[in-house]
Structures are given as structure tokens and as C-alpha cells.
Amino acid sequence: MTKSELIERLCAEQTHLSAKEIEDAVKDILEHMASTLESGDRIEIRGFGSFSLHYREPRVGRNPKTGDKVELEGKYVPHFKPGKELRERVNSGL
């Protein structure tokens, strides 16, 4: 599901809100989540999961075009860990 599809689905379910209000709310939520992770903080949504940053160590990679070895710097990457309720719901739906 894309952000646009999420907004469309919410518009269909929340008929008392305008499409612009829903779009703004979704964008605000995502912006707040991104800025929280950017500042190094963790996000926990009970029953859904948590977002945090994991550090990837520097390593030697390979340029796929040339095959040359390339030094890759260490970096932080976003990580999502699903909560127990979400895992159970997904597994029961399959």
C-alpha cells in the first residue's frame, strides 16, 4: 500500500473528514516519525511495533557495474520490529 492508497482508504472510511484534512494528518504523522528517528529517538506504538535505528558497521562493498571493491562507511538505518499483536494478526490471516 502506498501513501496515496492509504489516504484514499481513510477518505472512504472517514467521510466526516475532508480529503485534505486526512492527507495533512498522514503527512504530519510521517514527518513527526521521521524527525523522531532523525534525532535518534525510538518510536513505540503498542500492539503495532517499534521503530528504531540500527548501526551498520563500515564494510567493503562491490560496485555492481565494474566489480571494483568500494569502502562503505558505517551508517544508521531505520529498523522496524513488529509487535506481538501485529505478528499474530498477520499470521492468523495467512
UniProtKB/Swiss-Prot annotation:
<keyword id="KW-0810">Translation regulation</keyword>
<dbReference type="InterPro" id="IPR000119">
    <property type="entry name" value="Hist_DNA-bd"/>
</dbReference>
<keyword id="KW-0804">Transcription</keyword>
<dbReference type="GO" id="GO:0005829">
    <property type="term" value="C:cytosol"/>
</dbReference>
<dbReference type="Pfam" id="PF00216">
    <property type="entry name" value="Bac_DNA_binding"/>
</dbReference>
<keyword id="KW-0233">DNA recombination</keyword>
<dbReference type="GO" id="GO:0006310">
    <property type="term" value="P:DNA recombination"/>
</dbReference>
<dbReference type="GO" id="GO:0003677">
    <property type="term" value="F:DNA binding"/>
</dbReference>
<dbReference type="GO" id="GO:0030527">
    <property type="term" value="F:structural constituent of chromatin"/>
</dbReference>
<comment type="similarity">
    <text>Belongs to the bacterial histone-like protein family.</text>
</comment>
<dbReference type="GO" id="GO:0006417">
    <property type="term" value="P:regulation of translation"/>
</dbReference>
<keyword id="KW-0805">Transcription regulation</keyword>
<dbReference type="GO" id="GO:0005694">
    <property type="term" value="C:chromosome"/>
</dbReference>
<dbReference type="InterPro" id="IPR005685">
    <property type="entry name" value="IHF_beta"/>
</dbReference>
<dbReference type="GO" id="GO:0006355">
    <property type="term" value="P:regulation of DNA-templated transcription"/>
</dbReference>
<comment type="function">
    <text>This protein is one of the two subunits of integration host factor, a specific DNA-binding protein that functions in genetic recombination as well as in transcriptional and translational control.</text>
</comment>
<keyword id="KW-0238">DNA-binding</keyword>
<dbReference type="InterPro" id="IPR010992">
    <property type="entry name" value="IHF-like_DNA-bd_dom_sf"/>
</dbReference>
<dbReference type="InterPro" id="IPR020816">
    <property type="entry name" value="Histone-like_DNA-bd_CS"/>
</dbReference>
<comment type="subunit">
    <text>Heterodimer of an alpha and a beta chain.</text>
</comment>
<protein>
    <recommendedName>
        <fullName>Integration host factor subunit beta</fullName>
    </recommendedName>
</protein>
